[in-house]
Amino acid sequence: AASDVYKRQSLNQAGALVHVYTDGSVRLNHGGTEMGQGLFTKVAQVVSECFNIPIDYVHISGTNTDEVPNTSATAASSGSDINGMAAWKAASVIKKRMLKQASKVFQKSPSSIEFRNGLILSGNKSMTFKELAFSCWENRVSLSSTGFYKTPKISWDQEKFKGSPYFYFTWGAAVSEAIIDIDTGESRILRADIIQDCGSSLNPLIDKGQIEGGFVQGIGWLTCEELYFNPEGKLLTLGPSTYKIPGSRDVPPEFNIKLLENAPNEEKTIFRSKAVGEPPLLLAISHFLALKNAISMASETSNADLLNAPATPSKILAAVYNDHSM
């Protein structure tokens, strides 16, 4: 959890509901909200991995408090951590029941039975996941379960300002190359090299996309997203026509992203992964500092200390020409 609100233990919990049907399909519902960040895909992967079935078998229904009540906000980069673990717990309960039924069918001990790519194997005997699901139904074995997870090892006393509000920390590093026009104050990012600690990534492709998006969002925060108020305190930058957000031209032409290898999370998160939604935003500070370095190199009289975020053209010109009035 990254924000102050997530120092509340009550928001660090999640539930999930899993059903296995007699045709071998799996239905999943959990408390996380999909907003394009790939959460549903990641949690589906978790269930797929638990049963060792193709992900196509897993069908996710939209977040609904009729199915999983009292959901926590999908915020502070906690979605995969808490919902993924809740889904794993629910699926694990069902798998244990199915394993017990498989041991009766094969007349083998559960320890000798393996779930592998949609098959249930024991020695030279095998059956499909669908066949086992049907066998469970015929023998009145429940194929539904809920799962619940609460983040461990966290506490916070707001009055004493003491405690351990975060389960773990995420690390990253970035190097950026920037260019400025000393006549207009315009700036561009030319290159960014990022390495991000995602633990054992649940989905490297999704995580790289999150890193790209977070970094570009950070560029907007530090270079163009400026608030203007009139003398009466009314906000003037009310929409896209007045509040400038980053566009495709603000993405570095050379954009290199690497996930830290062989660095599983030391804490027992889902598959030893780490949060990746918001941390990369702060790596855009490397671009802001590159702009300050460019200003310092522009002339002997430039004053990079004048540059405050967001680094708009007028602010860059003021720093280049050491003009305190701009």
Q: What does each of the following model-derived ranges do?
A:
Residues 25-31, 190, 205:
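Structural motif
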Residues 22-29, 268-274:
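Glycine/charged-rich beta-loop-alpha catalytic/anionic-binding loops adjacent to active sites
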Residues 9-14, 20, 171, 251:
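Short, flexible loop/turn motifs enriched in small residues
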Residues 42:
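Flexible, small-/acidic-enriched active-site or ligand-binding loops
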Residues 1-9:
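Conserved small/polar residues in nucleotide/adenosyl-binding loops
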Residues 4, 45-326:
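C-terminal catalytic domains of large/alpha subunits in multi-subunit enzymes
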